[in-house]
UniProtKB/Swiss-Prot annotation:
NDH shuttles electrons from NAD(P)H:plastoquinone, via FMN and iron-sulfur (Fe-S) centers, to quinones in the photosynthetic chain and possibly in a chloroplast respiratory chain. The immediate electron acceptor for the enzyme in this species is believed to be plastoquinone. Couples the redox reaction to proton translocation, and thus conserves the redox energy in a proton gradient. Belongs to the complex I 30 kDa subunit family. Its EC number is 7.1.1.-. Its main location: plastid. It comes from Trachelium caeruleum (Blue throatwort). Keywords: Chloroplast, Membrane, NAD, NADP, Plastid, Plastoquinone, Quinone, Thylakoid, Translocase, Transport. This is NAD(P)H-quinone oxidoreductase subunit J, chloroplastic. NCBIfam families: PRK12494.1 (NF009141). It is a peripheral membrane protein.
Length: 158
């Protein structure tokens, strides 16, 4: 089943894969990593001016990593704004996805958290560095194949 936005993307020659609708009726797409930045700009111009959230997850041990974006099209006088969910997948060997910081500034800390926990590198992000874990931390704690260390030496904050 194809939704309104999917039909609009096809009409304008924008390559994507529809993943259907979630339980709330929000359409979900898969976008190729190399196409993500240009499609993000187009969606912003089309009216998806609010990035509600960004998160990431490990699909399976040794498998792909996913970056998920929830976008909302806010218009005055509309009770039910249009929403869409975008999934961008990256390989575990080279997990690189274009940052959309220049499109939605609110993605700043969210992409940094995804980098910190899963190791997804967001190309052209202005401040991509660890945000939760210490800089000296080795590995990506939310990957399914991550082996937690037996201990970690906590340093004084002084």
């Amino acid at each position: 089943m194809q939704g309104y936005l999917s039909a609009w993307l096809v009409k304008h020659g924008l390559i994507h894969r529809s993943l259907g609708f979630d339980y709330q009726g929000i359409e979900t797409f898969q976008i190729k990593s190399e196409d993500w930045h240009s499609i993000a700009v187009i969606l912003y111009v089309y009216g998806y001016n609010y990035l509600r959230s960004q998160c990431a997850y490990d699909v399976a041990p040794g498998g792909l990593l996913a970056s998920v974006y929830h976008l909302t099209r806010i218009k005055y006088g509309v009770d039910q704004p249009e929403e869409v969910c975008i999934k961008v997948f990256a390989t575990r060997r080279d997990p690189r996805i274009p940052s959309v910081f220049c499109v939605w500034k609110s993605v700043d800390f969210q992409e940094r958290e995804s980098y910190d926990m899963l190791g997804i590198s967001y190309d052209n992000h202005p401040r991509l560095k660890r945000i939760l874990m210490p800089d000296s931390w080795i590995g990506w704690p939310l990957r399914k194949d991550y082996i937690a260390p037996n201990f970690y030496e906590i340093q004084d904050a002084h």
